[in-house]
Amino acid sequence: TVVRMNRDTYYSAAVIDTTQGATLTIPETNGRYLSVMVVQNDHYIDQVFLEPGTHEITSDTDFAMVTMRIRANQSDPGDNDAIAALRAGVKLEVGGNASHVRPNYDMEQLVALRDELTVEGTKLGTLMGMQGAHGTIEPMMHLYGTAIGWGLLPDAQAQYLGSPKFANDGCYMASYAAPPFNEPGFFSITIYDADGWIYTEDGILNEFNMNLNEDGSFDAYFGECGEVDNNLPTVEGWNYILRIYEPRLDELQEFRLPEMKKIS
């Protein structure tokens, strides 16, 4: 079970035997964001594919999860058909056919450790440096990333800025500078409960359902705030992640989440 999921994209995934090679073919996307990451069995990601064409998959581990994200407009029911057509054009060809056997984890111990690491890791305020290729990530940072959000994209493909937890005791507001990204990237805010789960269908802000200022900046409201734009409902211990896909990393070095102000 993966915490801190999102509804920005449709996911498709397959666990494959990599020992006999594999290829992935991506069709033209007509400007829509589509990425495919290869998550190896030790949770490192050496390959992320965005360009149309046929790509060779390589892995240091015998098994890997090939995970595709396709940008979705959750405000448009008709968008499902366009996504289905695009997904049908993606081809994954795998030489091996061995089955992956999941270890028999002690789930009580696993969840307790995950929660402890999440508390420590979220104090950093960003998930930068928590995912990437073998040999590029500090082991402790990689462990934090695995606990906070399994399947994070590497820094060059996405940035994740996480908030602390807040009380469900009124209305909060924050003013955000325009998040820096390259096309076909985008940004979003997704809200979670204290344990990292999505608890409402209305828990996301992105370009399809929010109002932006002319310069791309925006105000967001959290909780019972009356008739305001960009308002997300809250529960006790609510928190959020600002995701930036295809980020401009040089501009993100100084980018931080704004102060959260309690206004009522």
Task: Give a label for each model feature.
Residues 1-264:
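A compositional/structural signature for long, glycine/proline-rich flexible linkers
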